[in-house]
Amino acid sequence: YLNRTLNLQPEDKMLIVLDLDNFKYINDTYGHQAGDQCLKVIAECLKKAYSRYGNCYRIGGDEFCVLFRKPEKEKYCREKFYWIIEKQKKSLHMLPGASYGSALIEEQESISDTKARADANMYANKKARKQAR
């Protein structure tokens, strides 16, 4: 599935995955139209933060990924993404947070295996964020 969805290029060096926090609550509380609006805003935030160094995709439900060319810029882009999200929350108060994970793309590894590693990092991030509250 991922191989068909993602246009993996030789210059892609890292896979970043993002999963929205408590997105079901937004759909259940405010309706699917509000949920769709949140998804559009998140997609726009991703584009603003990452498009210079990668390609952004929605890969299902409330999950997004970025094929990233410049791993050395990853921390900068991640901080920029979270800053943009916080700025957007001022006008769209129901905007959810996003949990984040990344993995370097290994030459002999399938993209599915890379995604599994990125997912494991993302779920660790999600767990740590919940415990910090």
Residue ranges and their predicted role:
Residues 41-107, 117, 121:
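GGDEF/GGEEF active-site signature
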Residues 15-17, 102:
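Conserved hydrophobic/aromatic beta-strand scaffold that supports enzyme active sites
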Residues 1-14, 21-48, 57-61, 65-66, ...:
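Conserved long alpha-helical elements within nucleotide-processing catalytic cores of c-di-GMP signaling
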Residues 30, 99-103, 132:
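Flexible, nucleotide-binding loop/lid elements of kinase catalytic cores
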Residues 126-129:
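Signal-transmission coiled-coil "S-helix"-like helices
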Residues 11-13, 54, 98, 131:
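PAS-family sensory domain
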Residues 20-21, 71:
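PAS/PAC or PAS-like capping segment
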